[in-house]
């Protein structure tokens, strides 16, 4: 028996293939639930917006419209992909794939509880910032490769918008890192066992949430795809699965930034009170519940607020959020140095 085991353990190629298969299965265990969550997030969004606007929302396909996301997915999957004659075909096809792939890569380090995560990086925050910075390239090259002035302007707007608000997001995150003393997402959550960072850093949470709206091109900052000005922006020439991949990438980033907000400010999977009833609830349920609250805020803002002008958007980022986040960074540093941590 031992010789039989050694025969296989010495076969490095077999071990390598086995590891690759395990990683593939583990990746699918993240990707498939995420795609299902995106599908039903669109249904919830349409229902909530319909309710705010005194409409019913989707209610024909299935009971209460529960099969509507499946119908929409099948429609996009079965439609013919139309390629513009004047487009750079290779880059045109690669752009939505790159956007969705980078959005998925960011989920590799997200901890849903103390033990359930794909990879526990000690520099998890830096990894997230790097991936979010790369995500804009898919949008830029899609606008350029489409050879359309509307798509190109949408890509330029998106690049300027994301770069503008990444600066303030980075400074806000530094405040959280100073308070927690770590770049590890799991340890940031555990550092909030005494107090959630949303309470001492509530103004920063508001700025982070508003900056997240701009970072994900969501209303009222959806200027890169403003229908009245740019038809549909950078994805105006896309149809079928190309459009679907951009759509999946956008909503993947929305769920991701909601999960990051939960980790940085709402103590991730930790219950609000240390009582038996709350401790009995699985940690992943708490994490999902808090993330859903942030997602509902995203949807409510889309339904309630009009779109900003582009100059107002840029001025908000550079003239208001950047100075405020810098000032709060100095304030946080001073308090932590004076009291050797948060004052009691």
From Swiss-Prot:
TM regions (residue ranges): 18-38, 58-78, 89-109, 123-143, 159-179, 195-215, 228-248, 253-273, 281-301, 316-336
InterPro entries: NADH_UbQ_OxRdtase_su1/FPO, NADH_UbQ_OxRdtase_su1_CS
Entry keyword set: Electron transport, Membrane, Mitochondrion, Mitochondrion inner membrane, NAD, Respiratory chain, Translocase, Transmembrane, Transmembrane helix, Transport, Ubiquinone
PROSITE patterns: COMPLEX1_ND1_1, COMPLEX1_ND1_2
Localization terms from the record: Mitochondrion inner membrane
Membrane topology (UniProt): Multi-pass membrane protein
Keyword Transport carried by entry: yes
GO cellular component, one term: mitochondrial inner membrane
Coiled-coil region: none
EC number(s) on file: 7.1.1.2
Top enzyme class: translocase
Reactions catalysed according to its record: a ubiquinone + NADH + 5 H(+)(in) = a ubiquinol + NAD(+) + 4 H(+)(out)
Protein's job: Core subunit of the mitochondrial membrane respiratory chain NADH dehydrogenase (Complex I) that is believed to belong to the minimal assembly required for catalysis. Complex I functions in the transfer of electrons from NADH to the respiratory chain. The immediate electron acceptor for the enzyme is believed to be ubiquinone.
Family under the similarity heading: Belongs to the complex I subunit 1 family.
PANTHER family to which the protein is assigned, alphabetical: NADH DEHYDROGENASE SUBUNIT 1, NADH-UBIQUINONE OXIDOREDUCTASE CHAIN 1
This protein's name: NADH-ubiquinone oxidoreductase chain 1
Organism for this UniProt entry: Cyanidium caldarium (Red alga)
Gene of this entry: ND1
């Amino acid at each position: 028996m031992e010789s039989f085991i050694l025969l296989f353990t010495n076969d490095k190629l077999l071990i390598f293939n086995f590891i690759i298969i395990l990683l593939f299965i583990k990746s699918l265990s993240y990707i498939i639930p995420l795609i299902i969550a995106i599908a039903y997030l669109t249904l919830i969004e349409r229902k909530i917006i319909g309710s705010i606007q005194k409409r019913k929302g989707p209610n024909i396909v299935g009971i209460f419209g529960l099969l509507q996301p499946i119908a929409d997915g099948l429609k996009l999957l079965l439609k013919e992909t139309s390629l513009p004659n004047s487009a750079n075909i290779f880059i045109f096809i690669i752009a939505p794939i790159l956007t969705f792939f980078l959005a998925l890569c960011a989920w590799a380090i997200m901890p849903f509880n103390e033990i359930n995560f794909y990879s526990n990086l000690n520099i998890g925050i830096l990894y997230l910032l790097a991936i979010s910075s790369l995500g804009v390239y898919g949008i830029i090259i899609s606008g350029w490769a489409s050879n359309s002035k509307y798509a190109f302007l949408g890509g330029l707007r998106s690049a300027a918008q994301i770069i503008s608000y990444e600066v303030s997001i980075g400074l806000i995150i530094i405040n959280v890192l100073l308070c927690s003393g770590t770049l590890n997402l799991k340890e940031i959550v555990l550092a909030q066992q005494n107090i959630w960072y949303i309470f001492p850093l509530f103004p920063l949470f508001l700025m982070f949430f508003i900056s997240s709206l701009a970072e994900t091109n969501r209303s009222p900052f959806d200027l890169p795809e403003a229908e009245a000005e740019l038809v549909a922006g950078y994805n105006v020439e896309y149809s079928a699965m190309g459009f679907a991949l951009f759509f999946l990438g956008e909503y993947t980033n929305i769920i991701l930034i909601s999960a990051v907000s939960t980790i940085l400010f709402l103590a991730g999977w930790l219950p609000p009170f240390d009582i038996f009833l709350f401790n009995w609830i699985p940690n992943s349920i708490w994490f999902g519940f808090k993330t859903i609250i942030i997602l509902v805020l995203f949807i409510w803002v889309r339904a309630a607020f009009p779109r900003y002008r582009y100059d107002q958007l840029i001025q908000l980022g550079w003239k208001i959020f950047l100075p405020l986040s810098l000032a709060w960074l100095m304030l946080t540093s001073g308090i932590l140095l004076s009291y050797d941590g948060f004052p009691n």
